[in-house]
């Protein structure tokens, strides 16, 4: 695993590519310029690509033996109310989010309601510029909009998390669902981790391109951009599963898709395909009737 300094530099390069001047990691926030030289900032995409290669090489050099994935129970066995975490990976592209209505609490992120016209119960945005953009479109007036307690966020309608964890939107939304909302049964859609191939396959090794529903749209990178380093998201979700062993995380994936092994080893992280997910939704409808 890459050292903390390397992870800060990598996160800073990612922030620079997004046009941000600050970076958050390990519960702290700092200036991007503190971690990158002026030369590196002139071409942040090139800098990011170099850092990703370094981190990948370091990770492989220290790779422990792969542990087998334990058997999982994929049947519908909810505890309490259900929460749907809607991330923005392309694996959910052909799923109609309206099927979730009336089945449980929906927690989306970033531009979901504006671009897809699907309004979840709650929305998570951790990037200050995105929060401002959504506020200008009056999104916080129509749903519960969460973010970190950062000074750049002035809209009083935004619900502030008590402490800035420095996490990405998906893992942060999951943690709020667990620790603020107290859900113990979570379904996670579109949290793909890996990049995507030109054929649209989510793959850890061959998926070299950006995997995001909104690539090419306002506030997002170009459609042909390289994939984003997922190590930080992965570690954050591992923390969620570890800190909440009594919660079940149903990770909804395509038939040819799987979770990173580090998560798959967790007994409460359960991959299910969309056919099995549809079965679960039908069971929810039966319980509600």
Where are these regions (language model features)?
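Metal-ion/cofactor- or nucleotide/acyl-coenzyme-handling active-site neighborhoods
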Residues: 4-5, 30-35, 56-289
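Basic, mixed-charge low-complexity alpha-helical segments
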Residues: 4-9, 49, 53
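A short, charged, amphipathic alpha-helix used as a generic interaction element across diverse proteins
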Residues: 40-55
């Amino acid at each position: 695993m890459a050292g903390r300094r390397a992870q800060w530099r990598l996160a800073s390069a990612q922030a620079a590519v997004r046009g941000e001047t600050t970076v958050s990691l390990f519960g702290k926030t700092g200036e991007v310029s503190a971690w990158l030289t002026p030369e590196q900032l002139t071409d942040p995409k090139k800098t990011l690509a170099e850092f990703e290669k370094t981190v990948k090489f370091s990770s492989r050099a220290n790779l422990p033996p792969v542990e087998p994935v334990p058997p999982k129970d994929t049947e519908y066995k909810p505890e309490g109310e259900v929460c749907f975490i809607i991330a923005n990976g392309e694996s959910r592209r052909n799923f109609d989010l309206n099927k979730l209505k009336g089945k449980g609490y929906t927690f989306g992120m970033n531009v979901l309601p504006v671009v897809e016209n699907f309004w979840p119960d709650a929305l998570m945005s951790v990037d200050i510029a995105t929060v401002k953009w959504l506020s200008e479109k009056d999104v916080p007036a129509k749903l519960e909009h969460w973010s970190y307690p950062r000074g750049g966020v002035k809209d009083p309608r935004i619900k502030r998390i008590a402490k800035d964890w420095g996490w990405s939107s998906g893992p942060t939304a999951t943690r709020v669902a667990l620790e603020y909302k107290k859900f113990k049964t979570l379904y996670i859609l579109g949290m793909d981790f890996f990049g995507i191939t030109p054929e649209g396959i989510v793959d850890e090794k061959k998926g070299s391109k950006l995997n995001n529903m909104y690539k090419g749209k306002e506030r997002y990178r170009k459609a042909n951009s390289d994939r984003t380093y997922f190590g930080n998201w992965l570690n954050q979700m591992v923390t969620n599963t570890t800190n909440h062993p009594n919660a079940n995380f149903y990770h909804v994936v395509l038939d040819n898709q799987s979770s990173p092994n580090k998560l798959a080893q967790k007994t409460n992280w359960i991959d299910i395909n969309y056919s099995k997910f549809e079965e679960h939704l039908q069971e929810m409808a039966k319980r509600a009737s």
